[in-house]
């Protein structure tokens, strides 16, 4: 219920306020609106097919946000910023020389919060066509294990300390929400407006 209140009902209220006051609504969404059953990066035109409650509530929020005449729905993935996140967790483990088990069969691209902010500012200042835009870090698609290895390498630790495992093995016996196996989002649409995201490996360095 909380997920729907925050991710669906909240955007609906904001969309009404934006419409009534002729404001531009920026709504952040997620790769979790997709099911991961793809062999290429997702485009903005691909149909949504969420696997869990969070993804379903975010998909509903997208629909609600688009009722505002002036809107930018920004889908992103694997966000890295202040506070707790995957990269920060891996850095902590690397600094303690811990050998973590990390899933290798969930793939995507990290997005640094600073780059996300730059992309949103670009949309608001250049005002391209309203709609949905994908905004993630540029660069190669990686599994969480490969991202962890990049973190270990950056801290001068042996990347082989990271132990790749399947999601099935990692979550064996643990309660967890289903996640898309492929989370890679195509950024061609926002790039066509003049914003080219930074390679995530540059941001990680």
Regions found by a protein language model. Give the residues of each.
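Mid/C-terminal beta-alpha module of Rossmann-like enzyme folds, strongest
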Residues: 119, 126-174
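Glycine-rich Rossmann NAD(P)(H)-binding loop
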Residues: 102-107, 133-141, 192
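C-terminal amphipathic/interface module of NAD(P)-dependent oxidoreductases
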Residues: 178-205
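NAD(P)-dependent short-chain dehydrogenase/reductase
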Residues: 63-108, 113-117, 121
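SDR active-site strand-loop-helix element
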Residues: 25-30, 35, 74-76
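NAD(P)-cofactor binding segment of oxidoreductase domains
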Residues: 1-26
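Active-site "gating" loop of Rossmann-like NAD(P)-dependent oxidoreductase/epimerase domains
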Residues: 31-51
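Active-site Tyr-X1-5-Lys
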Residues: 48-72
């Amino acid at each position: 219920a909380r997920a729907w209140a925050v991710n669906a009902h909240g955007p609906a209220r904001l969309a009404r306020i934006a419409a009534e006051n002729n404001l531009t609504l920026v709504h952040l969404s997620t790769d979790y609106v997709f099911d991961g059953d793809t062999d290429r990066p997702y485009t903005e035109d691909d149909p949504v097919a969420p696997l869990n409650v969070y993804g379903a509530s975010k998909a509903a929020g997208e629909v609600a946000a688009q009722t505002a005449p002036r809107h930018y729905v920004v889908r992103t993935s694997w966000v890295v910023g202040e506070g707790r996140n995957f990269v920060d967790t891996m850095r902590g483990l690397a600094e303690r020389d811990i050998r973590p088990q990390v899933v290798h069969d969930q793939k995507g691209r990290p997005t640094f919060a600073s780059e996300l902010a730059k992309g949103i500012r670009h949309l608001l200042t250049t005002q391209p066509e309203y709609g949905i835009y994908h905004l993630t870090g540029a660069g190669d698609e990686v599994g969480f294990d490969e991202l962890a290895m990049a973190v270990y390498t950056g801290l001068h630790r042996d990347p082989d300390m990271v132990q790749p495992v399947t999601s099935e093995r990692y979550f064996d016996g643990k309660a967890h929400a289903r996640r898309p196996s492929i989370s890679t989002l195509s950024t061609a649409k926002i790039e066509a407006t003049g914003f080219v995201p930074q390679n995530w490996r540059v941001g990680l360095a």
